[in-house]
Amino acid sequence: RILDAPMHGGQHAPPMRTAAYVYTGWHAIAERDAAFHPGFTEWELVRGCRPRFAGHHQPRIPALGEYDDRDPVAVARRVRLAHEHGVDALVFGVFWCRGKRVFEAGLDRGFLGSEVGDTMPFACMWANRMPRRVLPVRRQDLPVLDPAREVPSDEADFVEFVAMLADNYFCRPNYVTIEGRNYLSIFDSTFFVRELGVDGARAAIGAARRWLAAHGHRDLHLAAIEPNAETLPLAAAVGFDSVTHYVL
């Protein structure tokens, strides 16, 4: 399986694999309809880009044109092109806020419903920063979320999130693993640790691992994305297995 190889250096190190992040926000959702106008998508932002200096070529429209990422035919065509040009796996941003999801149709319908959905390796990244103008979210026992888009969590919520991933994605044969463990990254790892505290984050990650074991799932390989200088030295102690970047 792609990326399922020992993590070590030297002459026996596995060949490098290239995984591309995928933002699944290229379709309309009710929250954006209400915040902007019916049918709004971020293609409007792409079309609206203008040059800001000499040699700045804007707008940049994809060679295949705009598409709805819920369309499995359109998605399959683009995934095949990506694979043919050196992309070995896809890492989909999963938006989750205490049980609320947005833009899941791009992954569930567009990718997994396509002809390549059961063969192209893929993994998930917890996008614990909701897209603009899809907040606030209210649950009976919780306050309205801060519109700054940060996604608070706790141990029970993190276990529920990982359980959702396990039931829907980890169980698939083309899900990316590292040394036999399901790869999962957290977009704002610094906020996650700050929100729960070091002990709380460690407890949440440990509880999620125990839930996976109790329900017959593989363990996690949990990657912290761009932890800040304060969080980085704590990553291993908190329970992260690796550190990576989102934008270099």
Predicted regions and their residues:
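Glycan-processing catalytic domains of CAZymes
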Residues: R1-L248
